[in-house]
Amino acid sequence: VHQRIGFVVGAVTFSMSVLASPTLAAPSTLVGSDHEPIEVQRVQQGTATPPQQTAPTRPLIAVAHRGAAGTAPENTLAAIDEGHRLGAETVEIDVQLTSDEEIVLMHDTTLERTTDVTEVFPDRAPYDVGDFTLEEIERLDAGSAFDQEFAGEPVPTLREALDRLQEHEMNLLLEVKEPSLYPGIEHQISVELARSPYWLVPNAPDEPHRLVVQSFDWESTEHSKSLLPSVPHGLLGQVPKDRIADYDWAQMINPDHESIDADYVAAVQSAGLEIMPYTINEADGMWHVLEMGVDGFITDFPETGQRAIAEFLEGRADLAADEESEGSEESVELAS
């Protein structure tokens, strides 16, 4: 049973001591739908995490990569809106820290590729994210590099993204980029999430995860899990099959889609973890991993992904119906 950060469902009160201390919350009581109190434990850095649980059966999902990076500027509110418009239930975004320790959405560790930073700050090479304040980054245009239609689109903060996602009732796959460059970013993220307890309440077992935190830095991911034990965490990259059991604190492994096969998918799932490979933009590739048995996949084109999943499920249902029909015919023949 996962612990949760202290808040009260319904009234949504939260101990704001989280904002000033590594301790994320004082002990408090959750009130369930049946009004029975549920004790909530103190969550501290280094708290032991609960044992791995068997992965529930959740619907297949196509995660909108960096928003919907195929049709809107990545890691912007416009991309989140586009993902929502295209029917995505879950969005993946990347976060890093500014020099004044504000959390912003950005994939690359430099600002050059996706913004006009070289024009606004021509003497600030190499344009590392961590060398700029939030106020400076807010002056940048993160849309024009993708298309002039999005000129003036700003680099959003994590808080702005969380608000927009909640407004759309969307789920979040949150990637922590290069955490070794930003000591303490795991705690900064946990503090930001604590401002909106909505993100700390897991969805039902038959629904997509409301929030998953992931990174290629597995030590950072484990530390984040100790801070946010109620939140599922994922390992980006391919964990060797003989080491999957070592990561019993994780709930997900998300590798490059070209690095896996059906045996690897089965190994991950037999350990009670889910698997959602990245980044697949062609329908054939989506079908390929769906046939392996994955729990979902990450794509720049969520509309294509949703269509592939729908067609895959329809085909599987038709196959099951045919097999059931054949079985019924055989039973009739045997009876006669």
Model-assigned labels for residue ranges:
Residues H2-A11, S15-V18, P22-S336:
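Phosphate-group recognition and catalysis centered on beta-loop-alpha active-site segments
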